[in-house]
Amino acid sequence: MFKKIILMSLLMSLPSHASANTKKDPIFSISAIPNHITEDMVQKNIWNEKCPVGIKRLKLLNLSYYDFEGNHHQDGKMIIIDAMAEKVLAVFKELHKRKFPIAKIKLINDYNGDDELSMIDNNTSAFICREVTGGGRISLHSYGVAIDVNPVQNPYISINNLVTKVSPKEGANYINRTNIRAGMVEPVVDVFTNNGFSIWGGTWNDPVDWMHFQLTRAEAENLSDYK
């Protein structure tokens, strides 16, 4: 009996923050990109010397988010141009506050630099040096000033010779935008526009790119090393 009393006394004397340490506190930070990641970006042609922004201008963001089951994650990673890093951090802090569901936030490195694989996996991502879908000119993702959110719930569609192409094809069930479901971006467009991402691909006529938020091209060129 005496031992039980001592044990109870010890338990009651533990600091009140002990239980709080078991909770997942949100993580939002900006850091330089570690060498092993930049080397991987070069190896997988995610960045090369023809890109409009120098690799030293890019920052690694660590982000917390809620998934579609309401689980809390602290492992989100995204690469953004340094001049927009704080704004993007503010975006994801607000999405976290609203508990907006995000399937995952991983670097394109995890998909060997393949943007299609990233979209199919419903990955929210930002930097990758490439042309716009369909070709013709360099994508705003190449400047680190564009973000794609939940590609399955917010697909890219284009119409060519009366044939509609949906990317990723898993997003075909989300073409009807009047029926707002979890992960669709319409309820959070304001979060992006309030933080400088004035262009949303969901307002375009053809193609329509619901997942896509960006700065203007003039803003991107002004912020980058582009001449």
Where are these regions (language model features)?
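N-terminal module-boundary/linker segments of secreted carbohydrate-active enzymes
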Residues: 20-71
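C-terminal segment of classical bacterial N-terminal signal peptides
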Residues: 13-19
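Catalytic cores and adjacent binding grooves of peptidoglycan-active enzymes
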Residues: 132-138, 145-227
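Structured segments of extracytoplasmic/periplasmic soluble domains
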Residues: 64-66, 87-101, 130, 152-155, ...
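Sec-dependent N-terminal signal peptides
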Residues: 5-13
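Active-site acidic/histidine clusters and adjacent loop/turn architecture
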Residues: 53-119
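Mid-length scaffold segments of soluble, non-membrane domains
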Residues: 102-103, 117-151
